[in-house]
Amino acid sequence: MKDMTETDAQPRIAVLCSGGLDSAVLLASEISRLSVAQNKRACIQPIYVSSGFSWEQSERTCTQKMLQLAPFVGEVEPLAELECPITDTYPEAHWALTGDAPAYNTDDQEVYLIGRNILLLAKVSAYCAINQLEQIAVGPLAGNPFPDATPEFFSAMERALQEGLDHTLKITAPFRSLTKEEVIERGLDLSVPFQLTLSCMDPVDDKHCGRCSKCRERLQAFSRAHLDDPAPYAFRPKNPNTGR
């Protein structure tokens, strides 16, 4: 494996950023962690990966706005935007491409995007090897039911990527034991601008639709944390449990 040089001794990490609540708090948390551990600013590279999904334009817009505010501005590198198209792999009628998002009460298992994390990590790891970044931080939470979000998966991917790239690279999932409401509480402590985060599969003018299952997940987490979600909604359910 190729090691970091003396001049690159400070931490150099990539953080996958989707513009959503979890990745925003993850980025802020990494800034905080490294500022405490280091005497000088670490290289923290936020990365957004486009795959051709219908919600991505709104995600990018929100991410760019968010990074212009504390606690991010002046603390991270400019957003790196990579492309990893999946439109030639998924059927043309797939809901993630058409914008026909799963309904509010859809089970989490039904929104699994096959191969999503495999493709993301493959693309981002090549970027990391080229740019001498030594860690990728990702944001799955406790209870994530998908096979490409388990500790075993991340360990296996880490080994394969290090071997294939001949580059020392760690994959970390710091929030793997946290619930979404716990992530919200951490984000409050870190002054994350939740009003600019977007966790929606069918945004309307860069606002949450309030009708998809990602909006349900977000609204219910804020409700369990006894907080109002400050982000804008095209439709905001009065009851987060029913979506009405």
Write out the residue ranges for each language-model feature.
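ATP-dependent adenylation/nucleotidyltransferase module used to activate substrates
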Residues: 2-191
